[in-house]
Amino acid sequence: MDRAQKQEAIEALKGVFADSGAVVVTHYLGLTVAEMTDLRGKLREQGAQLKVVKNTLAQKALDGSVGEAGDALFKGPVAIAFAPDPVSAAKVATQYAKDNDKFTVVGGLMGQQVLDQKGVSALATLPSLDQLRGKIIGLLQAPATKVAGVLQAPAGQLARVMGAYAAKDAA
């Protein structure tokens, strides 16, 4: 790689670190091409990506913004999993690491915070952004539905009473 290509790669990584909800740093030593393709497919289904990065370029892209702890993540053969949703990449990477011994989660970055392996595992247990939005909408709609039911109940009872009087008068 010449200097211009390295600078372009650093700028691309800066964009990844800035635009991603969370970045999961992994070691992939020993994975076959088929296993990497399978992992990339699983990540893509969740809207995430996997990118093999050169450690020195990743450290320069971070530019000391997360300190020594962030630089320490980038040792050995490293791939980063990232997505706009902070949870999806962590979920897939953590699950894949459980299923495959050759793939390990080293840690992660979330904004300016460095996560260790346990932090990424904890992040993976959280519901995704879409699931949280669904729960919030459900919570907001539930009271309105109950209020509508309560308001309709007296009107229904009144209509039944009037119907009963009408039937009684007709008989």
From Swiss-Prot:
Entry GO terms, CC: large ribosomal subunit
CDD domains tied to this protein: Ribosomal_L10
InterPro entries documented for this protein: Ribosomal_uL10, Ribosomal_uL10-like_sf, Ribosomal_uL10_bac, Ribosomal_uL10_bac_type, Ribosomal_uL10_CS_bac
Annotated Pfam families: Ribosomal_L10 (PF00466)
GO BP term (any one): translation
Top-rank lineage group of the source organism: Bacteria
MF GO annotations: large ribosomal subunit rRNA binding; structural constituent of ribosome
Assigned keywords, A-Z: Ribonucleoprotein, Ribosomal protein, RNA-binding, rRNA-binding
Ribonucleoprotein recorded as keyword: yes
Entry's family note: Belongs to the universal ribosomal protein uL10 family.
NCBIfam families according to UniProt: PRK00099.1-1
Assembly notes: Part of the ribosomal stalk of the 50S ribosomal subunit. The N-terminus interacts with L11 and the large rRNA to form the base of the stalk. The C-terminus forms an elongated spine to which L12 dimers bind in a sequential fashion forming a multimeric L10(L12)X complex.
HAMAP family linked: Ribosomal_uL10
Biological role: Forms part of the ribosomal stalk, playing a central role in the interaction of the ribosome with GTP-bound translation factors.
Designated name of the protein: Large ribosomal subunit protein uL10
Species assigned in the record: Phenylobacterium zucineum (strain HLK1)
Organism lineage: Bacteria, Pseudomonadati, Pseudomonadota, Alphaproteobacteria, Caulobacterales
